[in-house]
């Protein structure tokens, strides 16, 4: 009888453990809850670019150059993109770094000096938030002026840009 009780106990324990194991929820991807656009308007001074934890580089779009709302380089209310730079400070409240901008262009560009009142570079492009995607480690936007899809991602120490030109004309090649 004692042997029977031990066997029943072991059997019930095994069934219980198996039942508990099969009820364990699968791993969740909590990054789907992240909205990188939070704080990019008002005075949040954040940016939506591609960032990894403890990364040395933060590739992100730059829509403004001067003034208070341009502290992080990006301001959600803007509809013009000046380019993409690699170092940004989140929530600073003061200007940062003075980055070199990268901007994919098509065709001949006219460069001219601009005054401090302008928030747009000569080669800036319009964009729509409808064609903008930001998620942890990835940023993408469609540049209307050049018909280019720009994609940015980051590792701990490097950024990767991919530019896809959707419109190719012989005029662009000739200029």
What are these language model-derived features?
Residues 11-19:
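Bacterial N-terminal signal peptides
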């Amino acid at each position: 009888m004692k042997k029977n009780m031990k066997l029943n106990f072991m059997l019930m324990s095994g069934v219980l453990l198996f039942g508990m194991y099969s009820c364990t929820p699968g791993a969740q991807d909590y990054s789907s809850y992240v909205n990188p656009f939070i704080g990019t308007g008002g005075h949040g001074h954040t940016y939506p670019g591609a960032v990894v934890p403890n990364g040395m580089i933060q590739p992100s779009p730059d829509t403004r150059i001067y003034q208070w709302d341009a502290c992080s380089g990006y301001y959600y209310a803007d509809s013009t993109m000046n380019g993409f730079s690699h170092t940004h400070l989140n929530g600073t409240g003061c200007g940062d770094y003075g980055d070199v901008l990268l901007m994919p262009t098509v065709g001949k560009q006219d460069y001219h000096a601009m005054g401090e009142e302008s928030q747009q570079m000569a080669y800036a492009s319009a964009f729509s938030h409808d064609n903008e995607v930001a998620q942890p480690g990835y940023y993408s936007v469609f540049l209307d002026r050049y018909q280019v899809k720009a994609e940015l991602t980051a590792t701990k120490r490097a950024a990767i840009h991919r530019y896809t030109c959707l419109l190719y004309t012989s005029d662009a090649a000739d200029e």
